[in-house]
């Protein structure tokens, strides 16, 4: 394989600011007159993964494709870069955790699990971050919106699919504290991503 293809792929992933699918990488390379089939691109990605093995960076495959990111072991070093505006509130974390595990879910169902009212600002914030979307409306009086997570949420959480989330304890009644606690490992990824975006 042409070593330059590997370097081109690395440049694209570094500069993109978002995950790139294999087909996107191939299309961009072709637009620049660089011939590479999907097999060559996969080899290039594997080589990058090996090259970053001893680095603070890693190549990660998430729901929307491939991206370069900081390894978990180094995300704590970024805390000094976080401003108060970029911090995720406990109530926001509880709400997104409930949506992730119970989706599709209504605002009323979230409030029932949390035991407190969900602020309109939290829902708006999650919609603005593109972490949730409305997937439809429940066939009950008032037809409340059904909320689900998005690919952006999966990308920011560094997972490919929602089933990659840690399993919840097996019992009928699960509190918001247990749900949020289960996803605490991923909280660092969400905060690190917020730093990168702002």
Q: Where on the chain are the PLM-derived regions?
A:
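Short amphipathic alpha-helical interface segments
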Residues: 13-14, 18, 85-105, 109
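Short acidic, hydrophobic short linear motifs in intrinsically disordered regions
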Residues: 20-28, 104-113
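Short amphipathic alpha-helical interaction segments
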Residues: 36-44, 116-128
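Short, cationic-aromatic polyanion-contact patches
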Residues: 63-75, 137-159
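Conserved small/polar residues in nucleotide/adenosyl-binding loops
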Residues: 188-197
